[in-house]
């Protein structure tokens, strides 16, 4: 069922990391998760024109650190940093703890799955033909280094009466391979005919390391000595008389045939 599973969830802790990186007990987990969802929805509406790819939320020691990945960081920061300060104050009011906001630039927006999906949905809302928007996005992604891309649109495409699904693929998109770096995202276009859903898979090559996965420190196991090992090394060779047998006896040697009265001599 590799075609059905979420590509990011399938690779969590292997080559991908979580978007919310914090721990909570059973009493606070639901409230903190709902808070994260509200923050992401607010940032999606507030920074609609800033080309935001993803948002990472961390909560270290009664604080919050939010990292916004955008291809247009100047729009997020604003003139002389005014917009970022207003954004920070609003996030502090919503979360109730001090918030630190970091902005990271996306160098290649043409190969980012979320930005590709958002771009296609914006074109669909402007009544651009869906095939033209999909093929243009695929050409740009392949031109800038993507090894494969797949785009799927579903809904009342071009305003037809019966909804259908169409998808196009260029290159290869190995969804079963865990080491494959697959970027996956979805978006929705709200048209006059209804909602059109867009899904994007981008294959960026194989990851030799852990990529964005959480780092787990491996504890080196100490080499335990053997139970019967001697400090001097291997055991010395056994001499005659050791091991519980009589002196001169050898394991597996034939017994003498003579009795005690003949002086130990054999029959002559």
UniProtKB/Swiss-Prot annotation:
Keyword tags: Ribonucleoprotein, Ribosomal protein, RNA-binding, rRNA-binding
Biased composition regions of type Low complexity, renumbered to the chain: 248-257
Chain positions covered by the region annotation Disordered: 216-268
CDD domains attached to this UniProt entry: KH-II_30S_S3
UniProt keyword RNA-binding, yes or no: yes
Biased composition (Gly residues): 258-268
GO biological-process terms attached to the record: translation
Compositional bias annotation for Basic and acidic residues: 232-242
Entry GO MF terms: mRNA binding; rRNA binding; structural constituent of ribosome
GO cellular component: cytosolic small ribosomal subunit
Residue stretches making up the KH type-2 domain: 39-107
Cited Gene3D superfamilies: 3.30.300.20, Ribosomal protein S3, C-terminal domain (3.30.1140.32)
Protein family (similarity comment): Belongs to the universal ribosomal protein uS3 family.
Complex formation: Part of the 30S ribosomal subunit. Forms a tight complex with proteins S10 and S14.
Purpose of the protein: Binds the lower part of the 30S subunit head. Binds mRNA in the 70S ribosome, positioning it for translation.
NCBIfam families documented for this protein: rpsC_bact
Entry protein name: Small ribosomal subunit protein uS3
Gene name for this UniProt entry: rpsC
């Amino acid at each position: 069922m590799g075609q059905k599973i979420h590509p990011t969830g399938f690779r969590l802790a292997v080559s991908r990391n979580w978007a919310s990186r914090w721990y909570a007990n059973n009493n606070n987990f639901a409230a903190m998760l709902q808070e994260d969802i509200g923050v992401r929805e607010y940032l999606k509406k507030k920074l609609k024109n800033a080309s935001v790819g993803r948002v990472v939320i961390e909560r270290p020691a009664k604080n919050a650190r939010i990292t916004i990945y955008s291809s247009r960081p100047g729009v997020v920061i604003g003139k002389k940093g005014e917009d970022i300060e207003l954004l920070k104050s609003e996030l502090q009011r919503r979360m109730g703890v001090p918030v630190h906001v970091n902005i990271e630039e996306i160098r290649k927006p043409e190969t980012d799955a979320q930005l590709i999906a958002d771009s296609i949905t914006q074109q669909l809302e402007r009544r651009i033909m869906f095939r033209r928007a999909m093929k243009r996005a695929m050409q740009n992604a392949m031109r800038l280094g993507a090894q494969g891309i797949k785009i799927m649109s579903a809904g009342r495409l071009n305003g037809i009466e019966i909804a259908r699904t169409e998808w196009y693929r260029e290159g290869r998109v190995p969804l079963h391979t865990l080491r494959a770096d697959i970027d996956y995202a979805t978006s929705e276009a709200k048209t006059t005919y209804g909602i059109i859903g867009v899904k994007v898979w981008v294959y960026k090559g194989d990851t030799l390391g852990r990529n964005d996965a959480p780092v787990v420190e491996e504890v080196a196991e100490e080499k335990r000595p053997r139970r019967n090992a001697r400090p001097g090394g291997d055991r010395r060779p056994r001499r005659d008389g050791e091991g519980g047998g009589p002196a001169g006896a050898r394991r597996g040697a034939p017994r003498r045939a003579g009795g005690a009265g003949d002086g130990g001599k054999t029959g002559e």
